[in-house]
Amino acid sequence: MAESVHSLFDRTAETYDRARRRLIPCFDELYRAAIEALPFEREDEIEVLDLGAGTGLLSAFVAFSYPRARITMVDAAEHMLEQARERFALGGDRFRFEIADYGEGRIAGRYDAILSALSLNHLPDEKKRMIFGQSFSALNPGGVFVNADRVLAETPELERRLHDSWLRRARELGVGESDLRQALERMELDAAATVGDQIEWLRVAGFREVGLRYRNLIFAVYSGMK
């Protein structure tokens, strides 16, 4: 049986964060764009859900930008989420952790923001649409959904060119061949979709002010408001 996405991420949990900045040449801009999509004041007490939280990288950006935010991190890769627990060990009950496959269940609770980074691309399109609908239902009025993710280009030729550019840039930044090989192995299990399709699915789910916030090579940030 082919190895699952969750087990692949568990197997690379220890080195995942270290390689991230080289595997994502636009790392800072990508995560900054996700945070800038949040329409809140710094001192607001917001409830945030991080889907596919992994080691807690995106949640760390949220926690720094919103020091009174309460953040729930969900991931099916237990070892990855253990890294997140260690990252936020001094945070008390401000941070919650749930080992679960969010693509197989329902989103429980009410939130002001539901975010994800480099996770939804692992789900087939019908499950992406399901998550968009569940997210809309789980958000408070005025809440926001934000996804920073790997996306598919609009044509096969453009996809090939962007993928080649990403590979070249990652190598220029010094990514280790082992880390790159593991990333390519994970990407073989991806089900990335175009930005246009995902924006349309958000609209169908009921979101307003839907749009692209950032795009660079094979990465993008898009969002929608309830």
Residue ranges and their predicted role:
Residues 26-44:
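Conserved alpha-helix/loop element of class I SAM-dependent methyltransferases that forms part
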Residues 129-141:
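A short glycine-rich, Lys/Arg-flanked "PGG" loop and its adjoining helix->strand segment in the class I
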